Amino acid sequence: MCGIIGITSSNEVTTRIITSLKKLEYRGYDSAGIATLSNGYINEVKCEGRVEALEKNIIQTNISGSIGIGHVRWATHGRPSTINAHPHSSEAVSVVHNGIIENSTLLKKTLEKQGYKFKSQTDTEVIVHLVTCLLYTSDAADE
């Protein structure tokens, strides 16, 4: 079980995402994270533990943006840790996920053969690399 929030706005969203994660924390308190988009860059802050710890890290990093996602996690794949906390991001994609990706092992092996490196023990990271791969190899990426 996990809690997920996403907000897009013309205003800064970080505080609203943290407030929402506090309300969702009963759905997972092993780890928490947030990613925002600011000036075309994905900024990510994650931590093991509760949203309170995440909030302290966010204050130190001064993360901001008008588009953002947040996640509180109850571990299903991989132990509770900062590296396994969501979101998982590449330079182009940031993903939060609740559920189990049944074919993640097969997808991971395929992506590793293409040179993608995995940092976490989660199945969610497969989505990040798969979407990134498709963005950079698809004709749709040019549109």
Protein language model annotation of sequence segments:
Residues 139-143:
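A short, hydrophobic C-terminal helix/tail in secreted or cell-surface proteins
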Residues 1-138:
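Conserved short alpha-helical segments that host acidic/polar catalytic motifs at enzyme active sites
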